[in-house]
């Protein structure tokens, strides 16, 4: 196997995820020679704006994909929730490895549970999806935008006027944070996760058969089927970071999938949600999207995409 160059965002979490995946690869191919190339994306450079107000898709992947096309890197290790549902021609997801916990983590001052927060409490999140779902259930709370890496957000919780923050549990786990800092993990029935949350997507060139053969050895087919249902729903709904959209699939021992798709208005006042089961992940994602479109969810998405 030739020497491989892995493209990664420069954030601590992205680099940690990349190193952990390389370790996983080396368990099946111990003699691999791999280096990481750090790449700064548009999403990384935007630190003073809410990403939902920037517009566009692929804010954290486009520059990395260009490096693949230019043969500067051989593969890219993405948080799958950052990857648009349609990839450019010539690129493919070479594998979907094991998935970390897909839930959202609620972290509050003095470990006060979400249900016990006083009216007017300020909850920090960078996600329209989280904000809309919290407001729907707890309209007397205030949602306040927060950006930065995990360390920065935890610091802001301590030093600024936030009473709580919500983060992806997967990032906390991968960065080695103890469960002790988490007040509670939020059940998907309360907070439907983001599409692909907790999963990684390993992107490479479609014609790189040598690398694709290697990646197949660390591919998790069950996770791939779950995220395929989720990403099909995202594609069919034309979702983006301007839209409060969620989707979460599970698979049972018989290979049967259960998928919940969610579309909301940013203020939490309109909610479209549907759960369905099936054996074909693509058909399942389409089925749920068709139902939500019939209910009127498409109007929310079209309006939000026009605003961006």
From Swiss-Prot:
Gene3D superfamilies: Periplasmic binding protein-like II, Porphobilinogen deaminase, C-terminal domain. It comes from Staphylococcus carnosus (strain TM300). One of its GO terms (cellular component) is cytoplasm. The keyword Electron transport does not apply. NCBIfam families: hemC. Belongs to the HMBS family. This is Porphobilinogen deaminase. It catalyses: 4 porphobilinogen + H2O = hydroxymethylbilane + 4 NH4(+). Its EC number is 2.5.1.61. InterPro entries: HemC, Porphobilin_deaminase_cofac_BS, Porphobilin_deaminase_N, Porphobilinogen_deaminase_C, Porphobilinogen_deaminase_C_sf. HAMAP family: Porphobil_deam (MF_00260). Monomer. Keywords: Porphyrin biosynthesis, Transferase. Pathway: Porphyrin-containing compound metabolism; protoporphyrin-IX biosynthesis; coproporphyrinogen-III from 5-aminolevulinate: step 2/4. It comes from the Bacteria. GO terms for molecular function: hydroxymethylbilane synthase activity. PANTHER family: PORPHOBILINOGEN DEAMINASE.
């Amino acid at each position: 196997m030739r020497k491989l160059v892995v493209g990664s965002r420069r954030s601590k979490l992205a680099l940690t995820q990349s190193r952990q995946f390389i370790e996983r690869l080396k368990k099946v191919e111990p003699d691999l020679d791999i280096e990481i190339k750090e790449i700064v994306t548009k999403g990384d450079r935007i630190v003073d704006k809410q990403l939902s107000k920037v517009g566009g898709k692929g804010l954290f992947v486009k520059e990395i994909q260009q490096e693949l096309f230019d043969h500067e890197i051989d593969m890219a290790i993405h948080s799958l929730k950052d990857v648009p549902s349609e990839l450019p021609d010539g690129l493919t997801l070479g594998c979907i490895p094991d998935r970390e916990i897909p839930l959202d983590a609620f972290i509050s001052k003095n470990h006060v549970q979400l249900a016990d927060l006083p009216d007017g409490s300020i909850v920090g999140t960078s996600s329209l999806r989280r904000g809309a779902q919290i407001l729907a259930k707890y309209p007397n709370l205030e949602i306040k935008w927060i950006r930065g890496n995990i360390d920065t957000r935890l610091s802001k919780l301590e030093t600024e006027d936030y009473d709580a923050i919500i983060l992806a549990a997967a990032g906390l786990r991968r960065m080695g944070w103890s469960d002790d800092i988490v007040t509670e993990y939020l059940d998907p029935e309360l907070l439907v996760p983001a599409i692909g949350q907790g999963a990684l997507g390993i992107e490479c060139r479609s014609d790189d058969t040598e690398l694709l053969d290697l990646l197949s050895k660390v591919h998790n087919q069950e996770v791939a089927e779950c995220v395929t249902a989720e990403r099909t729903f995202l594609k069919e709904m034309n979702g983006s970071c301007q839209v409060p959209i969620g989707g979460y699939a599970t698979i049972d021992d018989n290979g049967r999938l259960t998928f919940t798709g969610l579309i909301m208005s940013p203020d939490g006042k309109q909610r479209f949600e549907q759960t369905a089961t099936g054996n074909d992940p693509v058909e399942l994602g389409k089925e749920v999207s068709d139902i939500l479109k019939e209910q009127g969810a498409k109007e929310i998405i079209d309006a939000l995409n026009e605003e961006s």
